[in-house]
Structures are given as structure tokens and as C-alpha cells.
């Protein structure tokens, strides 16, 4: 089994709850190879969501809100709620940390969810369902369900590769210690070409939205934590997916009008 394949399997095991056949413990080079595979995991997730969408069209024709709600639910469940959990933990840390680095890191380790987590997760899900429903109504399911997962995970890979790890040890520690390779940049370029080829100007708007929130999120992480954590990387996936959906919608809704 090649290192690239092992890296893809490791990325699938880490980012989803899909049953992944795995042989032996991951090696250091597997962690390095897993980062460029993040957008590929997003593509696999998108294909699964498209298959579900085809089924939902049969049972709930033209019920765009119902379709979007069930798609978002499946989206979250396939990822094991990992990224939503990171979003909630990050929200609690930013509200309860009061600007203190150590306090913020401590809050993120607390398994309990505070009011900020509940509010932010709820808002994120509502916006995601609304944006996806609008895109389904515009017959843009292919673009929405492929582009958002790909760009969300590309953003996380670039964050991890280009940002220090804020903890001495943690779930994302092996990734942070893995050497960044040229393949991450090539993967990001591949994601850009894929998105623009699939959706044109709307895809470019999605990319620009993700780049904007990625730069902003990294700035916040460096200022508060001096780096990223697994939770903040997961939060970025969720926010980047929202940015991608809204970027697509902004262009497609206006062009349809």
C-alpha cells in the first residue's frame, strides 16, 4: 500500500465515520500524506451527499427545505459531528476565555457545551440549511454538495500546514508535527481548478469567500492562541463550508434573476 493511499485512508478515518479498512498504526509520513488528501475526503463526502439527494428527490420532490435539512443532518452525521463540536468548543472558548490564551485552551478541553456553543451551532445549522435549500431551488445541487465539502477541508489542510500547533499535545498533534509538503499547495491548486471548472464565477466567489474566512480565522487563532487546535480547525471547516455556500448563492441567485 502506497503512502498516498495510506494518507487518504487516514484522512477518511480522521475526518469521517465511514468504515475504513486500515492496516497497522499510522506512520509519521502517513500523517504528512493525509493533509493533501483532505479535499479528496470532501469530494467523497460530496458524492455521498449527491447520492442521498437523488434519493430525497424521489421521496420529497420539490420540498427543498426538507431536502436541505436532511442533507445537512447526514452531512454532520457522516463526519461524526466532529467539526460542529469544534465550532461549539471554539465559540465557548472565545466567549469564556476573555482574551486569555490558557483559559481559552482549557475551555476547549471541557466536554460540556456552554450557551455560546449551543447558539453558534444552531445559527450555523440554520444558515446552512437555508443556503442549501436556496441552492437546491436554483438547481445547483451538484455545485453546492461538491464544492462546499472540498473547500472546507482544503481550508483546514492549509491551516494545519501553515500554522503552529497551540498545544503541547492533542488529537491534531501528529498532523502539526508532520512536515508540510509541496503536495498541499498542489492540492489547493487542484481544488481551485476543480471548483472554478464546476461552477465558473460562482465557484470563484466561493473560493474567495473561503480564503477570506480562512485568513480571518487564522489571524484570530494566532492572536488568541498563538496557533491552531483540533477544535479551531474543525470550526474553520464549518465556517468555510458556509462561506462557500453563500458565495455560490450570491452569484447564482443574481444571475438567475
From Swiss-Prot:
Compartments in which it is found: Cell inner membrane
InterPro entries named in the record: CobS
Catalysed reactions, semicolon-separated: alpha-ribazole + adenosylcob(III)inamide-GDP = adenosylcob(III)alamin + GMP + H(+); alpha-ribazole 5'-phosphate + adenosylcob(III)inamide-GDP = adenosylcob(III)alamin 5'-phosphate + GMP + H(+)
Pfam families cross-referenced by the UniProt entry: CobS
GO MF terms, alphabetically ordered: adenosylcobinamide-GDP ribazoletransferase activity; cobalamin 5'-phosphate synthase activity
Membrane topology designation: Multi-pass membrane protein
GO process annotations (BP): cobalamin biosynthetic process
UniProt superkingdom: Bacteria
EC id: 2.7.8.26
UniProt pathway annotation: Cofactor biosynthesis; adenosylcobalamin biosynthesis; adenosylcobalamin from cob(II)yrinate a,c-diamide: step 7/7
Keyword Transmembrane in annotation: yes
Gene Ontology CC terms: plasma membrane
Cofactor: Mg(2+)
Residue ranges the record marks as coiled coil: none
Membrane-traversing stretches: 4-24, 40-60, 64-84, 116-136, 140-160, 193-213
HAMAP family, alphabetized: CobS
Family: Belongs to the CobS family.
Function summary: Joins adenosylcobinamide-GDP and alpha-ribazole to generate adenosylcobalamin (Ado-cobalamin). Also synthesizes adenosylcobalamin 5'-phosphate from adenosylcobinamide-GDP and alpha-ribazole 5'-phosphate.
Name of the protein described by the UniProt record: Adenosylcobinamide-GDP ribazoletransferase
Organism listed in the record: Alkalilimnicola ehrlichii (strain ATCC BAA-1101 / DSM 17681 / MLHE-1)
Gene: cobS
Amino acid at each position: 500500500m502506497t503512502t498516498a493511499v495510506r494518507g487518504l485512508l487516514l484522512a477518511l478515518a480522521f475526518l469521517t465515520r465511514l468504515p475504513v479498512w486500515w492496516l497497522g498504526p499510522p506512520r509519521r509520513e502517513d500523517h504528512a500524506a493525509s493533509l493533501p488528501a483532505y479535499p479528496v475526503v470532501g469530494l467523497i463526502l460530496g458524492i455521498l451527499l449527491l447520492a442521498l439527494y437523488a434519493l430525497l428527490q424521489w421521496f420529497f420532490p420539490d420540498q427543498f427545505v426538507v431536502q436541505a435539512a436532511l442533507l445537512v443532518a447526514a452531512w454532520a452525521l457522516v463526519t461524526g459531528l466532529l467539526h460542529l463540536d469544534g465550532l461549539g468548543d471554539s465559540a465557548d472558548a472565545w466567549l469564556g476565555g476573555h482574551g486569555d490564551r490558557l483559559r481559552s485552551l482549557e475551555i476547549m478541553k471541557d466536554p460540556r457545551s456552554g450557551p455560546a456553543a449551543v447558539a453558534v451551532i444552531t445559527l450555523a445549522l440554520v444558515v446552512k440549511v437555508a443556503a442549501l435549500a436556496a441552492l437546491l431551488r436554483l438547481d445547483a445541487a451538484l455545485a453546492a454538495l461538491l464544492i462546499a465539502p472540498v473547500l472546507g477541508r482544503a481550508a483546514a489542510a492549509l491551516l494545519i500546514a501553515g500554522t503552529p500547533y497551540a498545544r503541547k499535545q492533542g488529537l491534531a498533534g501528529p498532523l502539526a508535527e508532520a512536515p508540510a509538503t509541496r503536495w498541499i499547495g498542489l492540492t489547493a491548486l487542484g481544488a481551485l481548478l476543480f471548483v472554478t471548472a464546476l461552477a465558473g464565477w460562482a465557484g470563484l466567489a466561493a473560493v474567495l469567500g473561503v480564503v477570506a474566512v480562512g485568513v480571518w480565522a487564522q489571524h484570530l487563532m494566532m492572536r488568541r492562541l498563538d496557533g491552531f487546535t483540533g477544535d479551531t480547525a474543525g470550526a474553520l471547516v464549518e465556517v468555510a463550508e458556509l462561506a462557500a455556500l453563500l458565495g455560490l448563492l450570491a452569484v447564482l441567485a443574481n444571475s438567475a434573476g
